[in-house]
Amino acid sequence: GMYYSLWDRKVNADVKDKSLDATYNEYMIKQLNELIDIVQPYTHIVEFWFDGGWEKEHERWPAKEIYQTIKSREPECQIGINWTIGLPENPDAHPVLPENQKEGYPIRYFPSDFRLGDPYLPADNDPKLFSHDGKLYYMPWESTICISERWFYNTTDKKYKTVEELAGLYHQCTKNDNILILNCPPNREGKIRDADVTLLKELRKKITQ
């Protein structure tokens, strides 16, 4: 999977200047193609996770071009943009928490394959049908959780969730046909920490009993 911040604080720092959008959006599409070029010799990309879109109105982002660019090269790749859902009276309302999302609410960034709202978990009675241009689309919720405390590798990051806690989160996040991303940051050599591997094996045993 790939993480990409739509808002580049260096190249596109002045988000209020709409005259810069076209140039920046072209730059961004080229970057996405470059990332795919780098990864494809080694593996397929199964997910693109986009962030930072709330810094501009949704229509200023080339969501359709982003989607088509990725799908044309990685057809099975799933694509989501953080804080995917808006309000009927304001598609750019931010944030619309999962417990406040209702069937038929507008898809803020269309097209997308699933909903995001990091770091929140799905509501118990999570709706699935959301709207764009009068049509409804099925969109599960994806939760993003760290196996320890940090997203990125850090030598001081040694406080792990217990296998019982992870199993509970797994069931909570995947019921109702939803998705869980469990982050295990690789070290500086690109290897998963031994403690992560041990905990993942224990979790697998726990949830498959």
Predicted features and spans:
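Mature catalytic domains of secreted/periplasmic carbohydrate-active enzymes
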Residues: G1-Q209
